UniProtKB/Swiss-Prot annotation:
Similarity remark: Belongs to the class-III pyridoxal-phosphate-dependent aminotransferase family. ArgD subfamily.
Keywords associated with the record: Amino-acid biosynthesis, Aminotransferase, Arginine biosynthesis, Cytoplasm, Pyridoxal phosphate, Transferase
Subcellular location: Cytoplasm
Cofactor(s) needed: pyridoxal 5'-phosphate
Species: Bacillus amyloliquefaciens
InterPro entries: Aminotrans_3, Class-III_PLP-dep_AT, PyrdxlP-dep_Trfase, PyrdxlP-dep_Trfase_major, PyrdxlP-dep_Trfase_small
Gene Ontology annotations for the cellular component aspect, listed alphabetically: cytoplasm
Assembly notes: Homodimer.
Pathway: Amino-acid biosynthesis; L-arginine biosynthesis; N(2)-acetyl-L-ornithine from L-glutamate: step 4/4
UniProt name for this protein: Acetylornithine aminotransferase
Amino acid sequence: MSSLFQTYGRWDIDIKKAKGTYVEDQNGKTYLDFIQGIAVSNLGHCHEAVTEAVKKQLDSVWHVSNLFQNSLQEQAAQKLAAHSAGDLVFFCNSGAEANEGAIKLARKATGKTKIITFLQSFHGRTYAGMAATGQDKIKTGFGPMLGGFHYLPYNDPSAFKALGEEGDIAAVMLETVQGEGGVNPASAEFLSAVQSFCKEKQALLIIDEIQTGIGRTGTRFAYQHFGLS
């Protein structure tokens, strides 16, 4: 019996090693890996430059917490900021944590509470992430959910009319391509309507790029295809 908590439905494939776009199981069978660690290893498994950089860092400093300055962390943040519409970077452990931080920031910065998200969206399995997710199956068995989230049809520029004069909107949160929801790309017309709505309501626009960021759609971030800011 496994001692691992079964949070995922794992395949019966035990990986022994990986290189480039291939993984090999304990029996020596090789697989072409189209998943790449859910796009974490999108440079390929065991890329020489990445492996060398990790080894070098392990010989220097492992972890000293956020109580100390870290020049390499600052350099990485500057590079990320230079290729995005933002000026500041929050390093975290997962997409769900990033979304939690964005939700907290939106409410704290605006003083408002409502977050508009979309049907078939996926924003994580923490409580705020599940609450933001527009799929009931993700939430089954975990209620009651965190309040303040409202769901609209995705890719429908007219959907915002349903909100009328509703106020207290802190942010609109969306994926430029819905991943878990079925690989649904947003249209330029829809995203333009989203940005106009945010400006009208003085709400923040949160773009969840967990699956589309870092060059996976041809630009550094997918929102850059549409001139969003």
